[in-house]
Amino acid sequence: MKTVLGNISANEINAALCHEHICCYSEYLHMMSGRDYLDLPRLEEKAIAELKELKLKYGLNLFVDCTPVNIGRNIELLKSVSEKSGVHIVCSTGFYYTDEPVLYSSSAETLAEHMIKDSKNINAGIIKAAVEDETLNSFNAKLLTATAIAQKELNLPVAVHTNANNRNGLKALEVLLENGVSPQKITIGHLSDTENMEHILEIAKSGCYIGLDRMYDNKSEEYINKKVNAILRLCDKGLENKILLSHDESFFNGFEASPKLKDNTRFSYVFEYIRPRLPESVWGRIIRENPIEMLEV
């Protein structure tokens, strides 16, 4: 599998988080306001320290950074954090769903060419795609088509940001499948945002991965039990080998109303609150084996 510091083998992996971010930010605002907007050196120090701690306490040594190029992907930052923390980091090529002039004016084929070149330059291990609204418009379809073209050339897995409450994961999945992407190469993300198990199972029928990758910092018994029960129900349906756990967390989210470097993150949540309630065999499958199978190329 591919990381920012080079390729690694499966036997190097102990535990993986499959949908996270070191940071998401606007390069435009950073150019305009510098450290008043984002103090990158301070963020880097914090990320290194926290990843070191996660590795020491929980064995985490693979961190999939799903930040696409147009919301602040910073390869030099990822390389430095990986090298100094000892945690392997997988980076993404691909585009977020935001309608930007260059994305609007370029064809699917042209965007795919950019992704292919970018992936080879940065050793990307995953392609990020994204849909948000209930209805997929022609712009969304074009980005997904570009993703499919690039995927078939690169043979990389695709991670799709979706809005589970809009049920748009099915629509994104349909476009990718129609354009020749194998379901085994697709993760439909953020399905932990819905309690509609029928919707999740409908997506799972395709054979794609199920991203239960938005675990929030909610320590109530009700919330924890809902998340654990959803995992166990999927296991009962024979889907144990298709579940991916993560948080969709970042040290800095520059798109919030008042963005700031976070004092507390929730990267440890699944280790502290989900793991103790799962059989060890299920936990091992979800936190290690499934990520390896998803990422191997």
What are these regions, as identified by a protein language model?
Residues V69-N70, I188-T194, M215-R233:
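Active-site glycine- and acidic-residue-rich loops that bind
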Residues G86-V87, L154-P157, L177-Q184, E202-G211, ...:
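Glycine-enriched alpha-helix->loop->beta-strand junction motifs that scaffold or abut catalytic
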Residues N121-E195:
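Divalent metal-binding pocket/active-site signature
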